[in-house]
């Protein structure tokens, strides 16, 4: 009777251009590792789950790979790197849909697709920045200037939103609910300043000064400025409503944790309490802020209908009057889409920061 074929535990991960396999065998001797007809063949003497024996396995890859695997032996395992022929993301490792029992994801090395794309972009940006720095001057000087600029920007924003937060808090304790109705006239100038300055964040992300993705910051910037400049700024009837207080208070609460975190990051400091707050307070505050903004839009619809502001009539032969409230209803949909985009981005940031378990990947 033929001896039973023993297979070792194999863990895999990927990037767009290569595959990583970790074979759990210690004290490996005489390894035979090759790729023929897109099938990886492995056979070696080593100590695995069944003791000191000969272990082997074969894996037919999902897509084409280069036939020259690179492997490295350590005392505890065998690390194999295989280059993909085309740089792309694979939905699984093997051609067969059912995963072999001995194969599992290597969560220590795994990144999901969006993370891998961010890593790829970061590497490309790093190379481009390196070339720019070599041609422009001392890397240390430019890095110091960049950190100084970002530190001052975040400091100014922190002071601005702190002033708004403290002012509104003190007035609430002194005046109670009466403070709700003149919030706009009290803090609007500072909010205008902070929100106009917030455009710099999207510019920084777009030109590569920071590594933040452009889309989430742009969604937040456009959404807030639409509420501030269009809903509140152009309609005096909206400026005396209580919803202004809740919108401004939630915005400022989020920012008095976010900007100090960025300030400390500029000087390579990590205050654990602040870090936890920065990656946690948004969980209740972002939905609350979205709800408050939605209420302000809904309350403004009859006001815009009554005044006819920003409404227009299509030219002949259509001659249909298009009310601005129609666009506000569309905006309500976009508002919750923006919440989803930002929520997803911030959740992934939090997951990476605190090392939560990644989803199971086949």
Swiss-Prot record:
Predominant location: endoplasmic reticulum
Keyword Lyase in annotation: yes
Domain CS: 5-94
Record's GO cellular component terms: endoplasmic reticulum; endoplasmic reticulum membrane
Regions of this protein lying in the Lumenal compartment: 171-189, 234-242, 302-325
Location of N-acetylmethionine modifications: 1
GO-annotated biological processes: fatty acid elongation; sphingolipid biosynthetic process; very long-chain fatty acid biosynthetic process
Family under the similarity heading: Belongs to the very long-chain fatty acids dehydratase HACD family.
Organism taxonomic ancestry: Eukaryota, Metazoa, Chordata, Craniata, Vertebrata
Biological function: Catalyzes the third of the four reactions of the long-chain fatty acids elongation cycle. This endoplasmic reticulum-bound enzymatic process, allows the addition of two carbons to the chain of long- and very long-chain fatty acids/VLCFAs per cycle. This enzyme catalyzes the dehydration of the 3-hydroxyacyl-CoA intermediate into trans-2,3-enoyl-CoA, within each cycle of fatty acid elongation. Thereby, it participates in the production of VLCFAs of different chain lengths that are involved in multiple biological processes as precursors of membrane lipids and lipid mediators.
This protein's name: Very-long-chain (3R)-3-hydroxyacyl-CoA dehydratase 3
Modified residues (Phosphothreonine): 7
CDD domains: p23_hB-ind1_like
Cytoplasmic side: 1-149, 211-212, 264-280, 347-362
PROSITE patterns referenced in this protein's UniProt entry, alphabetically: CS
Membrane-spanning intervals of the chain: 150-170, 190-210, 213-233, 243-263, 281-301, 326-346
Superkingdom, taxonomy of origin: Eukaryota
Disulfide linkage: none
Gene responsible for this protein: HACD3
Origin species: Bos taurus
Enzyme Commission number(s) of this protein: 4.2.1.134
């Amino acid at each position: 009777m033929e001896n039973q074929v023993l297979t070792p535990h194999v863990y895999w991960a990927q990037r767009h251009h290569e595959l990583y396999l970790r074979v759990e065998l210690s004290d490996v001797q005489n390894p035979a590792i090759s790729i023929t007809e897109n099938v990886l063949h492995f056979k070696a003497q080593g100590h695995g789950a069944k003791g000191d024996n000969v272990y082997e396995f074969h894996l037919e890859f999902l897509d084409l790979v280069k036939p020259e695997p690179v492997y490295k032996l350590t005392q505890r395992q065998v690390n194999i790197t295989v280059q993909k022929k085309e740089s792309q993301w694979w939905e699984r490792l093997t051609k067969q849909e059912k995963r072999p029992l001995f194969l599992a994801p290597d969560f220590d090395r795994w990144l999901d697709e969006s993370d891998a794309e961010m890593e790829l972009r970061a590497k490309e940006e790093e190379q481009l920045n390196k070339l720019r720095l070599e041609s422009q001057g001392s890397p240390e000087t430019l890095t110091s200037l960049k950190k100084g600029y970002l530190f001052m920007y975040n400091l100014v924003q922190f002071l601005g939103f702190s002033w708004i937060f403290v002012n509104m808090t003190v007035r609430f304790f002194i005046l109670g609910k009466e403070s709700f109705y003149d919030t706009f006239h009290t803090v609007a100038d500072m909010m205008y300043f902070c929100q106009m300055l917030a455009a710099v964040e999207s510019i920084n992300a777009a030109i590569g000064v920071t590594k933040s993705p452009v889309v989430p910051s742009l969604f937040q910037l456009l959404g807030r400025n639409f509420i501030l400049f269009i809903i509140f700024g152009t309609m005096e009837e909206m400026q005396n409503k209580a919803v202004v207080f809740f919108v401004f208070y939630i915005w400022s609460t989020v920012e008095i944790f976010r900007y100090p975190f960025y300030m400390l990051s500029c000087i390579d400091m990590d205050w654990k309490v602040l870090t936890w707050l920065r990656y946690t307070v948004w969980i209740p505050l972002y939905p609350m802020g979205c709800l408050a903004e939605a209420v302000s839009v809904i309350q403004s619809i009859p006001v815009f209908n009554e005044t006819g502001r920003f409404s227009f009539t299509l030219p002949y032969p259509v001659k249909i009057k298009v009310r601005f409230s129609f666009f506000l209803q569309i905006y309500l949909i976009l508002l919750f889409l923006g919440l989803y985009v930002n929520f997803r981005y911030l959740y992934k940031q939090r997951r990476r920061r605190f090392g939560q378990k990644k989803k199971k990947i086949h």
